[in-house]
Design a protein with these regions (language model features):
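Bacterial N-terminal signal peptides that target proteins for export
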Residues: 1-12
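Surface-exposed short loop/turn segments
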Residues: 24-41, 47, 103-152
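Soluble periplasmic/extracytoplasmic beta-strand elements of cell-envelope proteins
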Residues: 50-55, 68-70, 122-126, 139-145, ...
Length: 208
């Protein structure tokens, strides 16, 4: 083997080693929006209805496994090394369902045969914005509607909310802020669900 060939081979080997080293130095971190199961149940009586949490609508640019964060006023970054365990829409539905089941003391029958002797409240959530600024804050803007399939004319309650949650630390703190924002949203939906079940004249809970 000539000197130039050996030198070329060494250069290629060094390049491969550096590439493998770079890959090894950047582990992928996975996150979930579902809060820990050890949270206390609601002190209120169990709701006399089941719920059906429908798939959550999410802006197309956010509905992926890679975390998407804001940079300044108009920039975004797609973080391939900071990822959700499932696409964001699935994570949001799972997190919302978990919160509502705990707060209402009921069951989410999505994907199951509907109970015969219990009304089922359908809940639909559409995320309009979910902006995350690392080291700063999370802003959530969403619309939701709820209604009982048994109601005549399909009457539903439709509401809107905007939330902001501080996120002063790293990516784990950013995820925690998003969990808290979803929990706050679930609290408002819970109030409206209980109110709507008692009276179809119930309006949306005012924002604090």
């Amino acid at each position: 083997m000539s000197f130039s060939a050996r030198a070329c081979l060494r250069a290629v080997s060094l390049t491969v080693a550096l590439a493998l080293s770079a890959c090894a130095s950047a582990p992928v971190h996975y996150y979930t929006l579902v809060s820990p199961a050890a949270q206390p149940a609601s002190a209120q009586p169990a709701a006399p209805f089941a719920i059906d949490v429908l798939p959550v609508g999410v802006p197309a640019e956010l509905d992926q496994q890679a975390m998407v964060v804001r940079q300044g006023d108009s920039g975004v970054a797609v973080l391939d090394d900071e990822r959700w365990v499932a696409p964001l829409g699935d994570q949001l539905r799972a997190a919302l369902s978990t919160q509502l089941v705990r707060r209402l003391g009921t069951q989410d029958v999505a994907g199951l045969t509907r109970p015969v002797n219990q009304p089922v409240l359908g809940i639909r959530l559409q995320i309009r914005r979910l902006d995350a600024w690392p080291g700063h804050a999370v802003q959530l803007e969403a619309d939701w509607s709820l209604g009982f399939a048994q109601d005549p004319n399909g009457v539903r309650l439709t509401c809107h909310t905007q939330l902001q949650q501080a996120a002063p630390g790293g990516y784990a703190d950013l995820v925690r802020a998003q969990q808290l924002a979803i929990a706050s949203l679930a609290g408002r939906i819970t109030e409206d669900a209980r109110g709507w079940a008692q009276s179809r004249q119930h309006g949306c809970t005012p924002q604090a």
